[in-house]
Each structure stands twice: as C-alpha cells, then as structure tokens.
Amino acid sequence: MFVSFEGIDGCGKSTQVNLLVNYLEEKGIPYIKVREPGGTHLGEKIRELLITQEMCARSELLLFLASRAQLVESVIKPALKNGKIVIADRFAHSSVAYQGCGRELGPETVKILNDFATDKTYPDIVFYIDVPVNVAMERMKNQHKDRIEKEGKEFWESIRNCYLKMAKENENFVIIDGTRTIEEIHREIVKVFNAYL
C-alpha cells in the first residue's frame, strides 16, 4: 500500500506522517517513509537546490520531477514489491498544486509530466490535511522559511483551492480537517488507514 500526505505548508502534514509511522512501528507493520523532494542521494541534492536557489517555475517543476522519478525507481517500487507500506510526506499531487496552480504552469501539464516521472505509480490513499491559509501562515510565522514558503497569501490560496479541486475529483483523496487537535486528526487517519488494510 502506498499512502501520501498532502497539504499547504503549515497544515500539520509532517506531524501526522510521523504519528502514522509511530503507529506502524507499534503494530510491527513493515513500512518505509519517504519525503519529497528527497528520499534518495540524488533527491536530497535536488532538495538543497530547490530550497536555496532562485529559479524559474519550469526549472522548479523539472527538478521536483527528477527527484520524484529517482525516488519511485530506487525506493518506492522496490518497497511496494517487497510488501512494505510506503508513507510519503508529499508526492505527485504537490507538484500539481504548487507548480501547476501556484506557479501557474497548468495542472494538466503537470499531471502529464507526473505520469512520466512516476511511471504512473500513485498512492492508494492521499490524506489531504486542509487548513485555511491564514491558519497555516499563523502556524509558520516564527519558523525559518525556505524559498517557496516565503510566497504570499495569493500563492497559498491558489494551492489550497487546487488541492480541494483534486480532492473532489479523486476517490483516493481523504480530506482531513487540519484545524482539529493533533490527536483527533491522528485518530481519523488511523481509522481510514485501517479500513484500507
């Protein structure tokens, strides 16, 4: 099974990834946790470029896709083949939202490129943790921000709207209200996850 977590920065996604991983550990369920960009030697080098270097939107997208392609071939496909559950802190839907909508490269264009980069390997479940942009921005106000996280409210609204549209169009999306407590969110995620097992 392949599970990804999506949402705008500040939604609490990474916290929930770690809680689900802890749950799998406790249950003795074999898994692998990956993050995007990154998760491989090449991916981590690309991550550093994406976070620190100024670049045009197309370059940004192509770097994300390169990292993703390597992650799928080197880590995700082998893990799935070996019966492990893959837990991804972001995956292909992030590019549709961030580069397709936020950077205005077009969601359909990004979807086509994602198909190529992932060899059409997609999550069985996408937990989309939804929070209003002002809530996410408030949560992040005292954190060090990378190049992308420094974008303005309009950028984040576009991304959130894109995620909500994808959630309506894809049966494997599960919308999670990210304004609730960490524990409430975790309980809902575990309940949905167990229903898929």
Swiss-Prot record:
Entry's Gene Ontology cellular component terms: cytosol
SUPFAM superfamilies, alphabetized: P-loop containing nucleoside triphosphate hydrolases
Pfam name, any one: Thymidylate_kin
The keyword Ribonucleoprotein belongs to this UniProt entry's keyword annotation: no
GO biological processes: dTDP biosynthetic process; dTTP biosynthetic process; dUDP biosynthetic process
EC number in record: 2.7.4.9
Membrane spanning stretches: none
List of residues binding ATP: G7, I8, D9, G10, C11, G12, K13, S14
UniProtKB keywords: ATP-binding, Kinase, Nucleotide biosynthesis, Nucleotide-binding, Transferase
UniProt cross-references to CDD domains, sorted A to Z: TMPK
Gene3D superfamilies to which the protein is assigned, alphabetical: P-loop containing nucleotide triphosphate hydrolases
Reactions catalysed, as given in the entry: dTMP + ATP = dTDP + ADP
Entry annotated with the keyword Nucleotide-binding: yes
GO molecular function: ATP binding; dTMP kinase activity
Similarity annotation: Belongs to the thymidylate kinase family.
Function: Phosphorylation of dTMP to form dTDP in both de novo and salvage pathways of dTTP synthesis.
Name this protein carries in UniProt: Thymidylate kinase
